[in-house]
């Protein structure tokens, strides 16, 4: 068994370090044996039998992200669970926004039989993107709550293969009223490196067509009489502009980018027929 010393560098990746890292060595062609360890956020030493491996590393103990398919490099993926427990009709089909996920994947790494420890310097990459937006809405005085979701962004991430995919589950987010606008912040997994649109997964989870998916923001306005009015905004063309600018030079959160709707598409919440009791 050979010693492998892993050093993790977080410079330029994040200031908020995760709790720790899980590293899995998957043997290729039956050479070697699967090794699965939890390391500190700075890394650590692992004992790995000589052989050829595919490797993944990611931060564990995330709040909303779960892992499935961890039996192989090809199948391991991150996803988020359904929004049960919100008590709002329709949200149980939605999934939570992912929290921070940092990932490294190596297709092939050869571990030789050696007395000397092999040193590996790794830098993980963030695979969750932040988005925000503001949009003007008329009639907000009739609204008691707003449920938001985005359809068509990546709701899962293939850690070994290194790309996000959409299984057509809407990602839920909270929407707040701010004067005559509504404002929201949400996250989704990164798409594949070379594509700006997510890969679509078929129901059988096998055939994958990399077709352009429409990306839609859906806002559901719950009114004072408990009726619901829905507005859909197609953001396929502008999704890149909604990527969160983050914190400005003055240390303040940048204001969310405004979505300019054409005059015919302005969102207006109709006055409820019944006065609230």
Identify the meaning behind each predicted range.
Residues 2-6, 21, 51-53, 129-131:
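Short structural boundary motif marking the start of a folded domain
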Residues 203-277:
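Hydrophilic extracytoplasmic domains
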Residues 7-18, 134-142:
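Structural motif
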Residues 95-183:
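A sequence/structural signal for flexible, mid-protein segments enriched
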Residues 33-126:
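Short, low-hydrophobicity acidic/polar segments
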Residues 22-71, 144-235:
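Tryptophan-paired
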Residues 1-13, 268-275:
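Bacterial Sec-dependent N-terminal signal peptides
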């Amino acid at each position: 068994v050979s010693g492998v010393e892993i050093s993790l560098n977080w410079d330029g990746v994040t200031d908020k370090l995760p709790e720790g890292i899980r590293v899995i060595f998957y043997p290729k062609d039956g050479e070697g044996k699967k090794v699965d360890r939890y390391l500190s956020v700075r890394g650590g030493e692992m004992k790995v039998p000589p052989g050829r491996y595919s490797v993944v590393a990611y931060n564990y103990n995330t709040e909303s992200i779960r892992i499935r398919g961890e039996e192989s490099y090809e199948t391991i993926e991150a996803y988020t669970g359904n929004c049960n427990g919100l008590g709002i009709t329709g949200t149980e089909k939605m999934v939570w926004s992912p929290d921070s996920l940092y990932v490294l994947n190596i297709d092939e790494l050869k571990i030789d039989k050696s007395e000397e420890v092999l040193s590996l310097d790794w830098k993980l990459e963030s695979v969750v993107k932040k988005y925000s937006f503001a949009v003007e809405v008329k009639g907000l005085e009739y609204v008691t709550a707003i449920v938001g979701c985005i359809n068509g962004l990546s709701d899962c991430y293939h850690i070994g293969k290194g790309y996000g995919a959409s299984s057509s589950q809407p990602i839920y987010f909270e929407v707040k009223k701010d004067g005559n606008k509504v404002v929201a912040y949400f996250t989704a997994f990164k798409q594949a490196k070379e594509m700006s649109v997510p890969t679509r997964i078929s129901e059988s989870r096998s055939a994958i067509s990399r077709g352009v998916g429409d990306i839609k923001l859906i806002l559901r306005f719950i009114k004072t009489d408990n009726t619901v009015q829905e507005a859909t905004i197609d953001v396929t063309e502008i999704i890149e502009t909604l990527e969160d600018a983050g914190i400005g030079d003055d240390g303040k959160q940048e204001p969310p980018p405004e979505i300019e709707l054409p005059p015919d598409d302005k969102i207006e919440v109709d006055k409820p027929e019944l006065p609230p009791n």
